Amino acid sequence: MRVDPGPLEGLTGAAVVQTWHLDLISAAVIALLASAYASCYRRGRDGERPVEPAQAGCFGVGMVLWVLATLSFIGSYAYVLFWVRALQVLMLLYVVPFFLTQGKPVTVVRAALGPAGRDRVDRLLASRWARVLAHPLTTSLAMLATPWLLYLTPWYTAALESEWIGAPTRFLLVVVGFGYFYARLQSDLVPRRYSQLISLLISVGETLGDGVLGLVIWQGSLIATSYYAGIHRSWGPDPRLDQTIGAGVLWILGDVVGLPFVLLLMRALSRDEKAHAVVVDAELDTAAAAESETAVPSALWWENDPQLRDRFRRG
């Protein structure tokens, strides 16, 4: 199914407000996931409170941003301007999944199930392949590789030209981003919890990787030249400037939207360190108590008897 961007005019303020994109697949997926989360949240709230309302609100914010990234002017102009496409990729890969994970969907779904369903979820989380897929290193590699593969292979042009590739690509971006934040933040139920120090170390390497990709797109050859030339766009920036702006969106704006993630990582690391300190203090107190009970008195045996102690002292 070939995509027809239509006779879009220049990207003005009026176009931002008035332009909407018909993306039935994204609309169906968003409606299905939002309905499922809302249903599970209501069912879980009747028995216990799995998540706070603010956390559920974060999931709703993620859904709204997903709508904006696919059904608003971004969804339309992503087929015409390179930098708008970069903005869409950034939102689907980073921003939308970040808010979705804050809603703790795994916890919400588990709380809505019965005892048998919860056991199945627990067994699934305890499986070996779940620990491998949800490992911080695995999800970080997928997060780092996806933009490189998208922009530096024919995948980018194919996703623009065919909706059979474009629709799964948009969904895949959200899935990869969700797995990344799910494994790194560990705010939801996860197969295994790792030290947040690992995530901070991984973030250093990711910053370098994102920066190099931005430089490659900025200084490298033009991407999808035949596709953009075939649109015959007579307004807006030229192809080189368009791609330069897109590189800035992916690089600079990507670092800006990543600041809340880093702050949450540091907060989680501080929380883990405090919990570890409590455990260590408890172990030290237990060891000290055991030593005091089994310790041999350093004084002579008769010094523990008041009468003998006074007699020997007078003598």
Model regions: which residues?
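Alpha-helical membrane segments of multi-pass proteins
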Residues: 1-315
